């Protein structure tokens, strides 16, 4: 595998390797190795990021790679250079891998056509996909629950604008999860792999094994999709009271950033969620992805083990 642009780029072997390797890293998070020594990884983020960018940088450095993060606000794009020329110039410097985030859906897939021999990771493109976040959530759920098959997973919030929702639905439904999406009618879209659509929040989370919350992406909203944050919170915020309708061992997830008091109460975020565990798993999973893309010999040798 040369690139990770979409969840469907991964087959079952790819996912199993990433899961097994990620859990090894997760259980040995204080242990560094030099599996990527001598590799150069460029982070090229055209959209703001805290967790994803930091997670990739920490993952790469802990594996011995050299990282270069391009500050787009001070790059030659401010002098009129096009995005494609920026990417082509960076690629001409022969980095081993480029990690790209863009506000434009499908942009990274289009860019990849100009870079057939370069390793590329999609760190999120518009509302299209965020494959590494879906892998993090998959690994987190499987780590805690021991499986994905037949779990009732409720994804709640701004489905319409969410790349995380799309990638998660594609991945988790492949492994047999029963996925419900829960949102106002104006924030819903038809997605393959969804079992149920709910506009009533309590109905949507009833009997859930996993509740995955998503923030309102106001920066992507071009039409009048909600009347107010206050009304949205009244109808769709997960709080102490409505959490009781889910299963007693439910896990509450959020890819971040959270808007406490809107989609999740302070109490649930701080006392009942596994948000920080997801962040920790994020470093482990991204280590595994980097190794899978860049350590070809390691993967080949593992594939020959009988």
From Swiss-Prot:
Signal peptide (UniProt feature, chain positions): none
GO cellular component: cytosol
Keyword terms of this UniProt record: Pyrimidine biosynthesis, Transferase
Catalytically driven reaction(s): carbamoyl phosphate + L-aspartate = N-carbamoyl-L-aspartate + phosphate + H(+)
Alphabetized InterPro entries for the sequence: Asp/Orn_carbamoyltranf_P-bd (IPR006132), Asp/Orn_carbamoylTrfase (IPR006130), Asp/Orn_carbamoylTrfase_sf (IPR036901), Asp_carbamoyltransf (IPR002082), Asp_carbamoyltransf_Asp/Orn-bd (IPR006131)
GO MF, one example: aspartate carbamoyltransferase activity
GO biological process: 'de novo' pyrimidine nucleobase biosynthetic process; 'de novo' UMP biosynthetic process; amino acid metabolic process
Residues engaged in binding carbamoyl phosphate: 51-52, 101, 130, 133, 256-257
Residues reported to bind L-aspartate: 79, 163, 215
Pathway: Pyrimidine metabolism; UMP biosynthesis via de novo pathway; (S)-dihydroorotate from bicarbonate: step 2/3
Enzyme Commission number(s): 2.1.3.2
Function noted in UniProt: Catalyzes the condensation of carbamoyl phosphate and aspartate to form carbamoyl aspartate and inorganic phosphate, the committed step in the de novo pyrimidine nucleotide biosynthesis pathway.
Similarity-based family: Belongs to the aspartate/ornithine carbamoyltransferase superfamily. ATCase family.
The protein's name in its UniProt record: Aspartate carbamoyltransferase catalytic subunit
Taxonomic source organism: Ehrlichia ruminantium (strain Welgevonden)
């Amino acid at each position: 595998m040369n690139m990770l642009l979409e969840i469907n780029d991964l087959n079952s072997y790819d996912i199993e390797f990433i899961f097994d390797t990620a859990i090894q890293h997760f259980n040995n998070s204080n242990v560094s190795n030099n599996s990527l020594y001598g590799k150069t990884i460029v982070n090229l983020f055209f959209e703001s990021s805290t967790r994803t960018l930091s997670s990739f940088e920490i993952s790469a450095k802990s594996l011995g790679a050299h990282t270069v993060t391009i500050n787009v606000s001070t790059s030659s794009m401010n002098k009129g250079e096009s995005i494609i020329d920026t990417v082509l110039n960076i690629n001409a410097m022969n980095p081993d891998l480029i990690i790209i985030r863009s506000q434009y859906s499908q942009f990274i897939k289009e860019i990849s056509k100009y870079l057939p021999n370069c390793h590329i990771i999609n760190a999120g493109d518009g509302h299209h996909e965020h494959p590494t976040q879906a892998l993090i959530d998959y690994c987190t759920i499987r780590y805690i629950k021991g499986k994905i098959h037949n779990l009732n997973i409720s994804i709640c919030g701004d489905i319409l604008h969410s790349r995380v929702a799309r990638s998660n639905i594609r991945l988790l439904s492949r492994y047999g999860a029963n996925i419900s999406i829960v949102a106002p009618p104006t924030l819903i879209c038809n997605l393959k792999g969804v079992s149920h659509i709910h506009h009533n929040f309590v109905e949507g989370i009833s009997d859930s094994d996993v509740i995955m919350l998503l923030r309102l992406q106001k920066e992507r909203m071009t039409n009048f999709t909600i009347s107010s944050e206050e009304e949205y919170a009244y109808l769709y915020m997960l709080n102490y009271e409505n959490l009781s309708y889910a299963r007693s061992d439910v896990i509450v997830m959020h890819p971040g950033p959270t808007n406490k008091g809107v989609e999740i109460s302070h109490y649930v975020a701080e006392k009942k969620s596994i948000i920080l565990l997801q962040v920790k798993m994020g470093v482990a999973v991204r280590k595994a992805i980097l190794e899978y893309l860049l350590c070809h010999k390691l993967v080949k040798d593992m594939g020959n083990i009988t």
